[in-house]
Amino acid sequence: MEGGDQSEEEPRERSQAGGMGTLWSQESTPEERLPVEGSRPWAVARRVLTAILILGLLLCFSVLLFYNFQNCGPRPCETSVCLDLRDHYLASGNTSVAPCTDFFSFACGRAKETNNSFQELATKNKNRLRRILEVQNSWHPGSGEEKAFQFYNSCMDTLAIEAAGTGPLRQVIEELGGWRISGKWTSLNFNRTLRLLMSQYGHFPFFRAYLGPHPASPHTPVIQIDQPEFDVPLKQDQEQKIYAQIFREYLTYLNQLGTLLGGDPSKVQEHSSLSISITSRLFQFLRPLEQRRAQGKLFQMVTIDQLKEMAPAIDWLSCLQATFTPMSLSPSQSLVVHDVEYLKNMSQLVEEMLLKQRDFLQSHMILGLVVTLSPALDSQFQEARRKLSQKLRELTEQPPMPARPRWMKCVEETGTFFEPTLAALFVREAFGPSTRSAAMKLFTAIRDALITRLRNLPWMNEETQNMAQDKVAQLQVEMGASEWALKPELARQEYNDIQLGSSFLQSVLSCVRSLRARIVQSFLQPHPQHRWKVSPWDVNAYYSVSDHVVVFPAGLLQPPFFHPGYPRAVNFGAAGSIMAHELLHIFYQLLLPGGCLACDNHALQEAHLCLKRHYAAFPLPSRTSFNDSLTFLENAADVGGLAIALQAYSKRLLRHHGETVLPSLDLSPQQIFFRSYAQVMCRKPSPQDSHDTHSPPHLRVHGPLSSTPAFARYFRCARGALLNPSSRCQLW
């Protein structure tokens, strides 16, 4: 589009040049116009020189015009990264579809049956980590790098894992006192076994205990006690008939585990059945989160002594002290409990079992541990788990999980235990200083556009606008990876306690203990930094309310979403819209009922209703639905994020010439901007969309585009077309 504007101005410029030549040639004194005989040779020479000078000026002016045209107009980007992106767009889009009626299919029509764009990028990032881990290097002995590579290789050594068989797991069971299933059981103290399971193996059979922020003081850590994480779907989410089938399948799975560990089939059946009975009774004690929140019982502060009175079967002090070493706990230590009634009922059940069926209680705990550790065991355990997952997904009408290669599992586990080490290696290769600098410049442009936009929102008064602008100005941004993750000297210290054993299971258990100790230690720092909720190679950005920081991991700022060599239209349309979306989450509280008392609530409510009606009017593919009460905040961030990114891009074009385009697409820079935005949303609709806080992919494309007048202008959409409605909403 810029090139076209430039060519329209060219004739006017040349007309002015011609005029200059005419004026120049007429400049002469009255004396020179007299017919003096002796001056004729000089006059001829002067005319020749004048003509040469005029021709030279015209030539220079033409060269200048050509140079400006070449540098201001959109030139095709012929680099390898641009050609790869061009091919990606051509492969995923269906340009036979009219963009003004179905831009999602225009951009994603051939990509509907593939994974979504974010999943594809996540897989690429894991492949990069795989290549890093499989390159032979000479690392400093005992370093985090050496241990990470050794752990990955141990995970990939399936021959050694198969050869070890159940031996390493049997040793663990013996250390815990054994169980009746194998015929060897020592009647140990129940709380001693529970303490070992929690502190040494990261297994919590009856409740969950973890460190989290204090409800009233987000930067103060506090131990939190919650319902356990069950290995089967919760009963309230399933119909009664399906619920019974689910437990039958789970019983079959537990029988397989007991048999694989050498148990007598009749004993295995008996103990597995009672384990299922215990789980079923624990299910009955659960109360939904919404109910607890409505009753004001989701965050209850109690001391360890008080908890001991409520649930006396558990030795809370010794179990928690062992789990959260090096914290120093006392009976007066305050805890946050998320379901007191569950803990009371759970304690009564444990006391009943200890009186009558202590050995079955031991088997229940051991079976749960075997389930937890099964990913580190041989192929027989893996196959049993795969069959259970397949059956459960069929019963709950979920699509089958695609088979995952072994390397991906090993990359993920290595990343869990050695995140700082892998973060440094990943960032060094995929997010160097020049890439980070370009990403920060993009973020600055997006942030400035948001601040400008806040000044013109009709539903904000001046005081609220100033408050909002200050909040954006004070925001911290962490780009690529946290500083903590990129300090190799810290990584070396953190891994000193990891002892990689002779079996893969032993190595996993050592890493589990080390990771738990590191998490506790990080919470105990006097001035803790923001703890990232994602790994640097992940593809999810987020905003932390408690720390007022926005995080963009290096894994997100990769092709096809971002690259310093891409046309600016691509970076602003894809990564820029994501950045703007996350920034708008700073103000989600203002959009909630009563969240902005100083705002023009009538205008705000009208904008709410307008946006909801706007999204409800769009047609959806069959078997696709969404809940507008769940998706409203994300819809608002999608619409506003696109508008802010476009505003930032338009300002960038005014200040910086020389934009490029992707060759062979026949799209202007502005059209590429919108295409890049839509490309981010490419994925197949899912039945789970009805429970998602994000709208289905069609709506995430069509909702924001139809709310943006510039889209209809650049794609020349007829008035009244689906993506050029007669009226629009403005919230942000």
From Swiss-Prot:
<feature type="disulfide bond">
    <location>
        <begin position="77"/>
        <end position="82"/>
    </location>
</feature>
<feature type="glycosylation site" description="N-linked (GlcNAc...) asparagine; in KEL2 antigen">
    <location>
        <position position="191"/>
    </location>
</feature>
<feature type="active site" description="Proton donor">
    <location>
        <position position="638"/>
    </location>
</feature>
<feature type="binding site">
    <location>
        <position position="634"/>
    </location>
    <ligand>
        <name>Zn(2+)</name>
    </ligand>
</feature>
<protein>
    <recommendedName>
        <fullName>Kell blood group glycoprotein</fullName>
        <ecNumber>3.4.24.-</ecNumber>
    </recommendedName>
</protein>
<keyword id="KW-0095">Blood group antigen</keyword>
<dbReference type="GO" id="GO:0031133">
    <property type="term" value="P:regulation of axon diameter"/>
</dbReference>
<dbReference type="GO" id="GO:1901380">
    <property type="term" value="P:negative regulation of potassium ion transmembrane transport"/>
</dbReference>
<feature type="binding site">
    <location>
        <position position="585"/>
    </location>
    <ligand>
        <name>Zn(2+)</name>
    </ligand>
</feature>
<keyword id="KW-1133">Transmembrane helix</keyword>
<dbReference type="GO" id="GO:0016020">
    <property type="term" value="C:membrane"/>
</dbReference>
<dbReference type="GO" id="GO:0048741">
    <property type="term" value="P:skeletal muscle fiber development"/>
</dbReference>
<feature type="region of interest" description="Disordered">
    <location>
        <begin position="1"/>
        <end position="37"/>
    </location>
</feature>
<dbReference type="InterPro" id="IPR018497">
    <property type="entry name" value="Peptidase_M13_C"/>
</dbReference>
<dbReference type="GO" id="GO:0010961">
    <property type="term" value="P:intracellular magnesium ion homeostasis"/>
</dbReference>
<feature type="disulfide bond">
    <location>
        <begin position="100"/>
        <end position="717"/>
    </location>
</feature>
<keyword id="KW-1003">Cell membrane</keyword>
<dbReference type="InterPro" id="IPR042089">
    <property type="entry name" value="Peptidase_M13_dom_2"/>
</dbReference>
<dbReference type="GO" id="GO:0005794">
    <property type="term" value="C:Golgi apparatus"/>
</dbReference>
<dbReference type="GO" id="GO:0042552">
    <property type="term" value="P:myelination"/>
</dbReference>
<comment type="function">
    <text>Zinc endopeptidase with endothelin-3-converting enzyme activity. Cleaves EDN1, EDN2 and EDN3, with a marked preference for EDN3.</text>
</comment>
<keyword id="KW-0472">Membrane</keyword>
<feature type="disulfide bond">
    <location>
        <begin position="155"/>
        <end position="410"/>
    </location>
</feature>
<keyword id="KW-0862">Zinc</keyword>
<dbReference type="Pfam" id="PF05649">
    <property type="entry name" value="Peptidase_M13_N"/>
</dbReference>
<feature type="glycosylation site" description="N-linked (GlcNAc...) asparagine">
    <location>
        <position position="345"/>
    </location>
</feature>
<comment type="subunit">
    <text>Heterodimer with XK; disulfide-linked.</text>
</comment>
<feature type="modified residue" description="Phosphoserine">
    <location>
        <position position="7"/>
    </location>
</feature>
<feature type="active site">
    <location>
        <position position="582"/>
    </location>
</feature>
<keyword id="KW-0482">Metalloprotease</keyword>
<keyword id="KW-0735">Signal-anchor</keyword>
<feature type="disulfide bond">
    <location>
        <begin position="610"/>
        <end position="729"/>
    </location>
</feature>
<dbReference type="GO" id="GO:0046872">
    <property type="term" value="F:metal ion binding"/>
</dbReference>
<dbReference type="Pfam" id="PF01431">
    <property type="entry name" value="Peptidase_M13"/>
</dbReference>
<feature type="binding site">
    <location>
        <position position="581"/>
    </location>
    <ligand>
        <name>Zn(2+)</name>
    </ligand>
</feature>
<dbReference type="GO" id="GO:0016485">
    <property type="term" value="P:protein processing"/>
</dbReference>
<dbReference type="InterPro" id="IPR008753">
    <property type="entry name" value="Peptidase_M13_N"/>
</dbReference>
<keyword id="KW-0378">Hydrolase</keyword>
<dbReference type="GO" id="GO:0004222">
    <property type="term" value="F:metalloendopeptidase activity"/>
</dbReference>
<dbReference type="GO" id="GO:0006874">
    <property type="term" value="P:intracellular calcium ion homeostasis"/>
</dbReference>
<feature type="transmembrane region" description="Helical; Signal-anchor for type II membrane protein">
    <location>
        <begin position="48"/>
        <end position="67"/>
    </location>
</feature>
<feature type="glycosylation site" description="N-linked (GlcNAc...) asparagine">
    <location>
        <position position="627"/>
    </location>
</feature>
